[in-house]
């Protein structure tokens, strides 16, 4: 009888340890996904701002490669859905993604202003930049005014506020997610003691 009881205890303990390890692994992955989303947003901002200042096509190309090829923001949200993240957490990241998509419009405008000022024909522009329609006011600006406007809109208070509208939901996601996963981990830890 004691051998059966001891065997059952060992199986229960092993199962509890695995549950704790799984909870810790989930917490680590969720945390990394939140970091990845914030980093992707920062990367896009950095590349768009570098292009606005240096006019180097390398930065423009890196920006659009992240959006169209690497797609970190979309991949993070897809992975969180696969992990059955709670709706509240997914909605926060969806809000951050929507706000990020809206900021892309400001960045496209800046890029288009630069490409226009530098005399690039539309067929030599990245599709997303070529298809951005500048306002009549933007079109009337001189070369120098276009370059200045392109820089200004990438560094003004409105841009910073828009950037905060991306990072704030990500920070809230991380707080809620950390609390939830810490609670899951604590339950798993208690099962091993």
Regions found by a protein language model. Give the residues of each.
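Amphipathic alpha-helical segments and their boundaries
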Residues: 2-43, 83-99, 191-192
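N-terminal alpha-helical signal peptides/signal-anchor transmembrane segments
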Residues: 26-52, 70-74, 93, 100-103, ...
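Short secondary-structure boundary segments
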Residues: 2-18, 41-74
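Juxtamembrane amphipathic/coiled-coil helical coupling segments that flank
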Residues: 11-24, 45, 114, 135-193
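Heptad-repeat alpha-helical coiled-coil/4-helix-bundle sensor or tether segments in soluble regions
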Residues: 57-153, 157, 162, 172
